[in-house]
Amino acid sequence: MTVLTREKKPYFGLTGGWLTFWVTVACATDMSLFGYDQGVFSGVVITRDFLEVHDLVGPEKTKTLSTVTAIYDVGCFFGAIVAFTIGEQLGRKKAILLGTTIMAIGAVLQAASFSLAQMFVGRIILGIGNGINTATAPIWQTETSQLKWRGKLVIFEMMMNIFGFCLVNWINYGLSFVGGSIAWRFPLAFQFFFLIILWSTTPWLPESPRWLIAHGRQEEATVVLSCLEAKPIDDPFVIAQRNEIEFSVRYERENSMRWRDLCQKKGNDSKTLRRLLLGAGSQFMQQFGGINIMSYYLPTVLMDSVGLSDTMARLLAACNALSYLVFSGLAVLLVERIGRRGLMLLSTFGQFLCFLIITILLRFSRISDNGEKFASASVAFFFLYYGAFGIGMLGVPWLYPTEINSLPMRTKGAAVATATDWITNFVVVEITPIGIKNIDWKFWIVWTVTNAAFLPILYFLYPETANRSLEDMDEYYRSNPALVVTKDPDAICRRRPQKYLQREEEEIERAAAAVDKRALSVGAVEHAEWTNAMGNKS
């Protein structure tokens, strides 16, 4: 058992904002690597040397090429399942270290590949590691962040995801002038830059206090909470936080549901299944909003659908990544002001509008004498699509499952959401080259319709999680809320509802009273001992 002392200074003496900063460095590095991996193959698959080495030259190889690209997402899906099955036992830190080590093996296999089979295996292994990490990092960040910073920091992670995506697009563009094997081997090997940072930071950072309490390690959790808040371990606020987490853990254990119960739709009063589906649904909508048509294939799309040259397609993809980074940065500023619901609605509407206009322009480019001008005009809306996606549907679907699910279900819920993301990602990446080749401009109608369909789902079914503690969401679902959230003003308002503020104040007052009572008791005992000692001397 850990012995707590005031003199003990874990985490190199870092507390408060600085400790949160270093947790964010680790989580943001993980998400930067995720973004890097999303973009790296867009340049690899149009590199002549890569295609020749792996016997992928020619239109008859389109199906194989789409599969070797998409198989990474299958690996990510199974990685999320691994996180779902053993992540709760390992803890947040160990799960990330496991995922990082697996990714290193996959990166070596890819960068050193001389056969299609080796590339397949490397991409699957890399995906497994990434699936573990992407299912875990947002939870770790969420559970170690103060309420006022939680949303901003997770969205910042996704901004760093786009930094990785932006970086690799410029690397791909620069290496296109070099040619040869280095044009694709170097970008694949550069993943070790991120992996080394993860190995260097994660081991010494704090474990999630919520995970520690859920596994009976209350003393360690109290130390972590006091360090994260930069307060003494007996501070009323720290004690109140610990008590709230303990209550949520006890409540969920008393009312917990097995997976069999979820599938049989047996009810319980914390709405576990509904919360699980809302979190997974946000990831489903992210992928079928069409983003990974662009992330994996933008140069291909610009060459095949718009008619641009290889060099111009790579350059525009790199420039687009910069604007994408700017819009993802705006989300950090807006996520608490507009809320999770507002950003998802705004983002999805923007995506719908962009795909609608892209569809119309590409249709006219096929039937008009000025077809080239219509095709060129569509490029602007590919850029704007990234902007619309970046301000909302980029980050919120990664944040939402970590907030909406209860503590005992948080790892499982985030893993199910991540698995949903990756299996739908695989579908999108697999069908894109085939769809563009076979149905041309009509392919874009599909994504126009899906985005339009998501708008009423988001508006009527998704409650707001901004400016709520994780325990607030547990209390909300214990109140047996209606399925349609627009009926309850507290469910959709951006500010923290008054009833949760009042409950927190009462808990702090009780904790302070308990501390005072304990201090008085200790003082009385010390006084009695001193009196007895003086009496004995007499």
UniProtKB/Swiss-Prot annotation:
Membrane topology: Multi-pass membrane protein
Gene3D superfamilies: MFS general substrate transporter like domains
Keyword Acyltransferase tagged: no
GO cellular component, one term: membrane
Cited InterPro entries: MFS_dom (IPR020846), MFS_sugar_transport-like (IPR005828), MFS_Sugar_Transporters (IPR050360), MFS_trans_sf (IPR036259), Sugar/inositol_transpt (IPR003663), Sugar_transporter_CS (IPR005829)
Transmembrane segments: 14-34, 67-87, 96-116, 120-140, 162-182, 186-206, 288-308, 315-335, 342-362, 379-399, 416-436, 443-463
Main localization of the protein described in the UniProt heading: membrane
UniProt GO MF annotations: carbohydrate:proton symporter activity
Places the protein is found: Membrane
Similarity comment: Belongs to the major facilitator superfamily. Sugar transporter (TC 2.A.1.1) family.
Record function comment: MFS-type transporter; part of the gene cluster that mediates the biosynthesis of oryzines, natural products with an unusual maleidride backbone.
Name listed for the protein in its UniProt record: MFS-type transporter oryC
Species this chain originates from: Aspergillus oryzae (strain ATCC 42149 / RIB 40) (Yellow koji mold)
